[in-house]
Amino acid sequence: MKEINIRCLVLSTFIVSCLFFENTLSKISFSKVAYINGSIHTFNQDLSIVDSLLVEDGLITKVGPRDLIIDEIDEDTQVIDLNGKMMMPSFHDAHSHPIWDGINQLKCVLTDLYDLQSIKDVLRDCLESELTKSTGWIVGSGLNIGLFPSGNPNKSILDDISKDIPIILWANDGHSGLANSKALELANITSDTKEPLYGVIERDLMTGEPSGTLRESSAINAVLDLAPKDTDVDYDKGLSIAQDMAHSFGITSVLEAAVGERHMAAYKRAAEREELELRVFTCLEYGKTSFAHDASTFEDVYQRLEQFNHERLNVNCVKIFIDGVLEGQTGALLEPYLDSGNIGELILEKDSLNKAVARFDSENRQVHTHAIGDRAVRAALDAYEYALKENGTLDNRHHISHLQMISKVDIPRFSELNVAATFQAAWAMPDEYITGINIPEIGIERVNRMYPIHSVFQSGGLIVGGSDWAVTTMNPFIAIETAMRREDPDGRLKGILNPDERMGLTEMLKAYTINAAYIMHQDHITGSLEVGKFADLIILDKNLYDITPNEISEVRVLETIIEGTTVFKIE
């Protein structure tokens, strides 16, 4: 008991010292930081919960009870009393578009607007903005097309804003857009224009005149390519915005789901300025871009991207689009859409897809596939199975994102093929897209089987978390609550989407920590709080295990730490 009392006295002295110098701590350099008196959830294999943790030179060196840490405290140690607060590993977002959506924040932002009048009010503000005056365009993002019948808004909405200034808006699904008459005129999109490859020009059923709604990038870019190009400064600002937002949500790693050379150059510039405070795992798109079917061109680009690799920046992933989305009926289904008899389209035919996946697998590259419809998910799983038969088991950690629909017979295949399921769990609730578009086009029975997260988990599949920001918020707590409740966290929308697919808290936290770190090939250095790993930590204002599921989306990150350095803090 004496030893314990003496140690407690010494510890108390350090705490008093730290409190006394609270206002000058930022000016003092400590080689060690001791966190004590916390509820520290390690997310190691045993899911241990401890009260203290020691960080030295950015690495975790001790994890356990306070007595284990006290021996290490000296004059070079900063002691932080967590006062019972919850600490856990930082989050890892395994599917996002940080730079692209960061740049979008510089333009006309329509995110979280749920009525036409609010949308028009923001557009009118954008019309009067300095950006529009200097560029002669309104380029916007975040339009909720679920607010419109069949997800097909009309150009007249934008013509009411301006008939002289071209306007092009990305929808918040990332696969649809809306253009006004001026923008369509500049792009020469008329009733005579043929459908673009893998895209759709929505039309008036009577006249064939373009309605203004465009599906997929091949159609949207016909307009967007005419708008002023984003500069390197825009890319740098976009990255800075995205990084700050990520830190505020406790995120220290992102998987950038589709990059080009300009994205990689922006990350590299930030790294060289010592301003890259995220771990970034990047994927180069194959199968849909202008060099999609030209292997030599793809390899040239891939090799150029590899030259940008840095300590926190890595490209070793290939992104393949298998299909589009249900909203434009470009999502590939096993059974037809009810109103058209269409079953969507696979972007790569079976043999080409199988050979591409097998080839990249043999080259030790991760293949990250976009699959929305159940036919697309099956095609992706078939391709991974083909690669497994061709190459044997390799440690490439392939995964499929989105997974809106999965046939019941394919659910066990995730575990059998060791393919991870990267869900955007924030989508797993009855929003305007599901109630206004999906139910009419595929029926309530199929809608009730959407986003079968628990079924994949129960069958042994690895569940991984990703936001697909800015389709939905980057905030992991919103995704986690939605996965647990299958309801709208805001309470704005009513209803539950198949409660049988509800997930537990621990498994969803693992999806955003150790599981996502695994997908990014960095679970050996981060993703859990274990000795020898980087001190990538977050401190929360509430203990997630002490509150009800409907409170989780309200939890705030108090501090985000990467490699022992605080990058976000609420004072």
Where on the chain are the PLM-derived regions?
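Divalent metal-binding segments
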Residues: I28-I36, H41, Q45-D300, N316, ...
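Bacterial Sec-dependent signal peptides at the C-terminal "C-region" and cleavage site
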Residues: I15-S31
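His/Asp/Glu-enriched, well-ordered alpha-helical/loop segment
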Residues: K237, A358-H368, I372-H398, H402, ...
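Bacterial N-terminal signal peptides that target proteins for export
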Residues: K2-V10
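Ligand-binding beta-strand-loop-alpha-helix segment within the catalytic cores
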Residues: A420
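Acidic (Asp/Glu)-rich catalytic clusters
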Residues: A271-E274, R304-N309, T393, S415-E416
